[in-house]
Amino acid sequence: MPQNTLNTVILAAGKGTRMYSQMPKVLHCIGGKPMVERVIDTAAALNPQNICVVVGHGKEQVLDTVKRDAVWVEQTEQLGTGHAVKTALPHLASEGRTLVLYGDVPLIDVETLETLLEAAGNEVGLLTDVPADPAGLGRIIRDGSGSVTAIVEEKDASATQKTIREINTGILVLPNAKLENWLNSLSSNNAQGEYYLTDLIAKAVADGIKVRPVRVRASHLAAGVNNKRQLAELERIFQTEQAQELLKAGVTLRDPARFDLRGRLKHGQDVVIDVNVVIEGEVELGDNVEIGANCVIKNAKIGANSKIAPFSHLEGCEVGENNRIGPYARLRPQAKLADNVHVGNFVEIKNAAIGKGTKANHLTYIGDAEVGSKTNFGAGTIIANYDGVHKHKTVIGDEVRIGSNCVLVAPVTLGNKVTTGAGSTITRNIEDNKLALARARQTVIEGWMRPEKDKQ
């Protein structure tokens, strides 16, 4: 039997009633990624012959959310873990081994699974744990010589068996040559009226197949999620591990306990991240980048020596070197900033290319625009890019000076070194080196008296 023929089955059909959520349990996220997706990615790292995911409750939602290359099998009736694996049998090889994983055990890692597979060889591998509180979990039964002989679920366990602290994590390696016969012989004659996958241990022993137990090196690696408290506990463990890895790699985290990584972070040297920062998706930070407190950075690239001030939100954007962003700035998708750009408080940029050295320091909206270098936006400048049906583009040249409280009504083009007077509404193109004013002339009313309230 070729030991390198590996099939994986991921059980993800449960309702998750204790989550009190309309979302299928396995779609709840750890580190910004659905739990079942994490398990699929871990399984894929083992290079198996196939990955079979058994779904049931919320099947359509799971399939719509998780875009991974796998065989998806529906368990129409939730009749237990043994029945779930049985539904996957038509997709498993007749030779080799099957690794059984769970869509709600998100932190299982490749190292643990490789150790289990090596220990199992061509026999049965069983991942066990000795948690602080084994209540509610299946107990490992051993004979006088210490060999595993069975697993007893707590609802079926005797008072003596309940004192056993070693528990079954549910993760198994099973020989395919025996698997079908074992599954077909399962009985639902138990406290829950279900077909237990754990009953295969006793069947293996009866057939003379050795059960090779491997104790997980840390309980959280095999911990399942049944409620929001457990989800939060694993999330915090995951985030702590991510923070520790970043610290080892030279990133300065002002408070590792107040940092969330919900994706992947690529970074240079001397990166500093302040408290309550959230990193999502694919993020790249260059050398000497500083991220201020309470920022959210999602799918963004930030060049060397740039500083992001507190409470800024960057998503789907590219920031050049030596930029100064924020506080309270928002860069939306397709915002692309060259080097030495300043974006100040309450400035929003969307789908716009901003040239080198340009500044928008206060209260400005720049959308669907192409802006040259060394241009300055006065406070309160608005690019009116939407006519109610379509978005239109604005082109602004180099060294343009836009006065405070101006509105640029797209589509419109401002040439190089144009100046607009404060309070102007610009609706027509302006040639290079021109001053444009588009506002009512001030009138002072002589002899005017301010109305006063009647004192009676």
Curated annotation (Swiss-Prot):
Binds 1 Mg(2+) ion per subunit. Its cofactor is Mg(2+). It is found in: Cytoplasm. GO terms for biological process: cell morphogenesis; cell wall organization; lipid A biosynthetic process; peptidoglycan biosynthetic process; regulation of cell shape; UDP-N-acetylglucosamine biosynthetic process. SUPFAM superfamilies: Nucleotide-diphospho-sugar transferases, Trimeric LpxA-like enzymes. The keyword Zinc does not apply. Its EC number is 2.7.7.23, 2.3.1.157. GO terms for molecular function: glucosamine-1-phosphate N-acetyltransferase activity; magnesium ion binding; UDP-N-acetylglucosamine diphosphorylase activity. Residues 250-456 are annotated as: N-acetyltransferase. It catalyses: alpha-D-glucosamine 1-phosphate + acetyl-CoA = N-acetyl-alpha-D-glucosamine 1-phosphate + CoA + H(+); N-acetyl-alpha-D-glucosamine 1-phosphate + UTP + H(+) = UDP-N-acetyl-alpha-D-glucosamine + diphosphate. The active site is at 362 (proton acceptor). Residues 229-249 are annotated as: Linker. It comes from the Bacteria. Acetyl-CoA binds at residues 379, 385-386, 404, 422, 439. Mg(2+) binds at residues 104, 226. Pathway: Nucleotide-sugar biosynthesis; UDP-N-acetyl-alpha-D-glucosamine biosynthesis; N-acetyl-alpha-D-glucosamine 1-phosphate from alpha-D-glucosamine 6-phosphate (route II): step 2/2; Nucleotide-sugar biosynthesis; UDP-N-acetyl-alpha-D-glucosamine biosynthesis; UDP-N-acetyl-alpha-D-glucosamine from N-acetyl-alpha-D-glucosamine 1-phosphate: step 1/1; Bacterial outer membrane biogenesis; LPS lipid A biosynthesis. HAMAP family: GlmU (MF_01631). Catalyzes the last two sequential reactions in the de novo biosynthetic pathway for UDP-N-acetylglucosamine (UDP-GlcNAc). The C-terminal domain catalyzes the transfer of acetyl group from acetyl coenzyme A to glucosamine-1-phosphate (GlcN-1-P) to produce N-acetylglucosamine-1-phosphate (GlcNAc-1-P), which is converted into UDP-GlcNAc by the transfer of uridine 5-monophosphate (from uridine 5-triphosphate), a reaction catalyzed by the N-terminal domain. Homotrimer. In the N-terminal section; belongs to the N-acetylglucosamine-1-phosphate uridyltransferase family. This is Bifunctional protein GlmU.
